[in-house]
Amino acid sequence: MNIGRIVQVIGPVIDVVFEEGQLPAILNAITITNPVINDEEDNLIVEVAQHLGDNNVRCIAMDVTDGLVRGMPAKDTGAPITVPVGKECLGRILNVVGKPVDGLGPIEAKNTMPIHREAPSFLEQDTSVHVLETGVKVIDLLVPFPRGGKMGLFGGAGCGKTVVMMEMIHNIAMHHGGISVFAGVGERTREGNDLYREMLESGVIKQAALIYGQMTEPPGARARVSLTALAAAEYFRDVEGQDVLLFVDNIFRFTQAGSEVSALLGRMPSAVGYQPTLATDLGELQERITSTDKGSITAVQCVYVPADDLTDPAPATTFAHLDGTVVLSRPIAELGIYPAVDPLDSTSRILDPIVLGEEHYKVARAVQVTLQKYKDLQDIIAILGMDELSEEDKLTVNRARKIQRFLSQPFFVAAQFTGVDGKFVSVPDTVRGFKEILEGKYDDLPEQAFYMVGGIEEAVEKAKKYQEQ
């Protein structure tokens, strides 16, 4: 066992000196016994980040460094951080180094995997396209998810990213029935607890592994927890040949933690203070999320947008890796339309007649055209009022307002707050509903009948109730 000594501790950065010729490799895990964490041996894992010269290595800690002193021994494990993987992890909550944090005892996993791995080669990747049904109208119609693809949920603070993601977990895990891996990266611990309890109640937890590195963790843990979750997902894909769902909330915190670590390591900051290696760090993570000839990983990632600015380097770099982007908009949330998806800003690579069929594609495009016309007319309406519009424009506005309201939907995961039961709407029902609105079949119904309903039949029922009143 190669043993060094701590020579310096600055927050989560630890310098360790080793004997001549005994330096551990970059990314190796080094263990230290920190009495502040608990009574166990080797309870603090640090990762080698730099070789400084004079046999010194600089490491980033995965847990608190309070209680460490100079001169303490540090053991080189000779390998990167390895975590337990496989069926034994299902139904459990792990931290960045694979230790359980749910109080249900140790994980007796037969297999372990390093968190740093190469992305699959060109030849191993699978490029066939299949649509994944989510049961959320606005997403299934306008931003269809590809199975084995990567989707991003973009939005500022409080636009509803986490709620949309929790609904996805509920709907896809319930109806798709595959294995899910959830990475909680630098988000609120309360939300992580909510998700766990919800999964326990619904029974989905039996098919899910939760990997948490929440806001309270040091930057080293937040920068690595998504890699731990990815290793768990890769095992199910590569070894067990499964189709895996990977949920990451929030990928921005991965970037944010990377920028903290980068500053601590003394690297020059780049644009807006981010790390100079922003594109590389994100690329190494995203390229591992892919479908191979053995199985697939379908990823849904929340992306926090600082100050609602989509040109910020973190969200802008993330855009390049995704097959589709669901943009959550504050003005739409202000109208009370949830999910607050912007139907004109959101895009999907597979919104294509070859993949979706001619009818779905035409309806989706017609919905976008109608909403765009309404958006263009809003200035005229604000200045001159509705009466100055032509009859054709009045009809467009009338239908657009119905479409806008019909894009809202009650969620299962929000039922406890709204008092309205959630609705799962199949893709054919979604397409039919919007097609009939566009054809003018419901021009005589009041627009409020279309707000917060599931299928179109429910809107018709609601309209009847309004008429009876």
Swiss-Prot record:
GO cellular component terms listed in the entry, alphabetical order: plasma membrane; proton-transporting ATP synthase complex
Catalytic activity as recorded in UniProt: ATP + H2O + 4 H(+)(in) = ADP + phosphate + 5 H(+)(out)
This protein's record includes keyword Magnesium: no
Pfam families linked: ATP-synt_ab (PF00006), ATP-synt_ab_N (PF02874), ATP-synt_VA_C (PF22919)
Chain segments annotated as coiled-coil in the UniProt record: none
Location relative to the cell: Cell inner membrane
Family classification: Belongs to the ATPase alpha/beta chains family.
Annotated function: Produces ATP from ADP in the presence of a proton gradient across the membrane. The catalytic sites are hosted primarily by the beta subunits.
Name by which UniProt lists this protein: ATP synthase subunit beta
Gene that this sequence comes from: atpD
